[in-house]
């Protein structure tokens, strides 16, 4: 379900958080369209944190620490990269109003980015909204192979350690499905969301000021001990 709403012109970061708590989120038709509309999918995409699919190749890449992972150090750049055209994605739903709103959420501590660096180059990353024990993944990008996937694995580990129970992807693409994303009906999603919102999720329970090795991240996600 989606609806255009004249009240969209009155959206603030605080209103946006209340909307997320109700299971709805805003989108734009395109990056050039100044309007916004509310969306509440009949089938909601989620990532079961205990069922993230990590291929052998991806596991090797994560374990190698080839890409340096940082948290919240380049939020605006990640947002800009997610909004930019890319091969197979000539247009996006991230317009200037979306960028301003989520930058506002970042300023008050409810939006976060995970960056994957190849040397000094920002090679991939993702951003999303944190509320209670729920994390709403908004968008990701990659400039090098598997960098967005590596960022996702690091995100999953951070959410598990932080006591989160819901990783919302909003919609499921073939790419996300290959990583373990699935769809649930709106009623089940709301129940999952309501439970998650009661939890005091801590996005920084896993330290952000020092590196976490890929081996440790894989151990967290797989529920094992790093070797």
Swiss-Prot record:
InterPro entries: Acyl_CoA_acyltransferase (IPR016181), Leu/Phe-tRNA_Trfase (IPR004616), Leu/Phe-tRNA_Trfase_C (IPR042203)
Protein's job: Functions in the N-end rule pathway of protein degradation where it conjugates Leu, Phe and, less efficiently, Met from aminoacyl-tRNAs to the N-termini of proteins containing an N-terminal arginine or lysine.
Gene Ontology CC: one annotated term: cytoplasm
Gene Ontology process terms (BP): protein catabolic process
NCBIfam families cross-referenced by the UniProt entry: aat (TIGR00667)
Catalytically driven reaction(s): N-terminal L-lysyl-[protein] + L-leucyl-tRNA(Leu) = N-terminal L-leucyl-L-lysyl-[protein] + tRNA(Leu) + H(+); N-terminal L-arginyl-[protein] + L-leucyl-tRNA(Leu) = N-terminal L-leucyl-L-arginyl-[protein] + tRNA(Leu) + H(+); L-phenylalanyl-tRNA(Phe) + an N-terminal L-alpha-aminoacyl-[protein] = an N-terminal L-phenylalanyl-L-alpha-aminoacyl-[protein] + tRNA(Phe)
Molecular function per GO: leucyl-tRNA--protein transferase activity
Top-level enzyme category: transferase
Keyword Kinase applies: no
Membership in a protein family: Belongs to the L/F-transferase family.
Subcellular location per the Swiss-Prot or TrEMBL entry: Cytoplasm
Name assigned to this protein: Leucyl/phenylalanyl-tRNA--protein transferase
Domain of life where this protein originates: Bacteria
Keywords in alphabetical order: Acyltransferase, Cytoplasm, Transferase
Enzyme Commission designation: 2.3.2.6
Pfam families the record matches: Leu_Phe_trans
